[in-house]
């Protein structure tokens, strides 16, 4: 089964492109490290398949938290990213969530309705 990672980014924060790129990178790295530690086989499959990553946009914090609830209930690795607040957003602002890597079909049940960033 195809594995992928999905990162959902809040569009209500009006972050610049560079800021979004950094936040997505934080999510991808932390999810990958966590996956390596708790499910090495899934991580290795994802890595060997080319480390597929999809970035989608969500409206606000409520949608991020709903994604987290669903991922937790399905046992999917997920990581919330909170910004340090040095540049564009306040300290502690949740900017995005990373999911996976995991089976594409499982992640699509959670994030399939969101548009690509």
UniProtKB/Swiss-Prot annotation:
MF terms (GO), sorted A to Z: peptidyl-tRNA hydrolase activity
Disulphide bridges: none
Record's GO cellular component terms: cytosol
Signal sequence annotation: none
InterPro entries listed in its UniProt record: Pep_tRNA_hydro_II_dom_sf (IPR023476), Pept_tRNA_hydro_arch (IPR034759), PTH2 (IPR002833)
EC category name: hydrolase
Keywords noted in UniProt: Cytoplasm, Hydrolase
Compartments reported by the entry: Cytoplasm
Listed PANTHER family: PEPTIDYL-TRNA HYDROLASE 2 (PTHR12649), PEPTIDYL-TRNA HYDROLASE 2, MITOCHONDRIAL (PTHR12649:SF11)
UniProt cross-references to HAMAP family, sorted A to Z: Pept_tRNA_hydro_arch
Name by which UniProt lists this protein: Peptidyl-tRNA hydrolase
Organism from which the protein derives: Thermoplasma acidophilum (strain ATCC 25905 / DSM 1728 / JCM 9062 / NBRC 15155 / AMRC-C165)
């Amino acid at each position: 089964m195809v594995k992928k990672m999905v990162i959902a980014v809040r569009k209500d924060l009006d972050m610049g492109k560079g800021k979004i790129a950094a936040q997505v990178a934080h999510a991808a790295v932390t999810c990958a490290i966590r996956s390596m530690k708790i499910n090495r086989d899934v991580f290795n499959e994802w890595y060997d398949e080319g480390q597929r990553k999809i970035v989608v946009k969500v409206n606000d914090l409520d949608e991020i938290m709903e994604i987290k609830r669903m991922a937790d209930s399905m046992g999917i690795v997920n990581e919330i990213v909170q910004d340090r607040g040095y540049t564009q957003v306040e300290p502690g602002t949740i900017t995005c969530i990373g999911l996976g890597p995991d089976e594409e079909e499982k992640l699509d049940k959670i994030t399939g309705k969101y548009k690509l960033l």
